[in-house]
């Protein structure tokens, strides 16, 4: 099993147990689902009486996103201006990390070009549709995971910056 950690702060963000699709060589997308968390069903083995009304108890179940829940991602908010300012600093930090790790100048240039194109073509036009999440540590300098819904309006998916993840085999 592979766990993908934030390269800047070490937060666990995703694993290969989710179907990761690489998009444009710059991000990973992972489809996720809304699951019911905390529902407990107690079966005491008794037959329900036809005369008694069924008891409807609130069992504390809540619908949560499976990736957000599994990796304890923390919801955060941005307006377009503050997100783009954050992203500028984040991309500089990733570039520095790539240089530190010995990536070639061509790879770094490809990252910068690809990231800029992805932001311009995908994030900015759909900005109002995204939800934003940080890792468990809530480090403001770490990766902000994007969550949106597919064209069907029902299937949620998350977006992770490929170069901002470090693969760890477990």
Curated annotation (Swiss-Prot):
It comes from the Eukaryota. The keyword Nucleotidyltransferase does not apply. Residues 1-170 form the TCTP domain. It holds the Pfam family TCTP. InterPro entries: Mss4-like_sf, Mss4/transl-control_tumour, TCTP, Translation_control_tumour_CS, Translational_control_tumour_p. One of its GO terms (cellular component) is microtubule. It is found in: Cytoplasm, Cytoskeleton. GO terms for biological process: translation. Keywords: Cytoplasm, Cytoskeleton, Microtubule, Protein biosynthesis. GO terms for molecular function: calcium ion binding. Involved in protein synthesis. Involved in microtubule stabilization. Belongs to the TCTP family. This is Translationally-controlled tumor protein homolog. It comes from Gibberella zeae (strain ATCC MYA-4620 / CBS 123657 / FGSC 9075 / NRRL 31084 / PH-1).
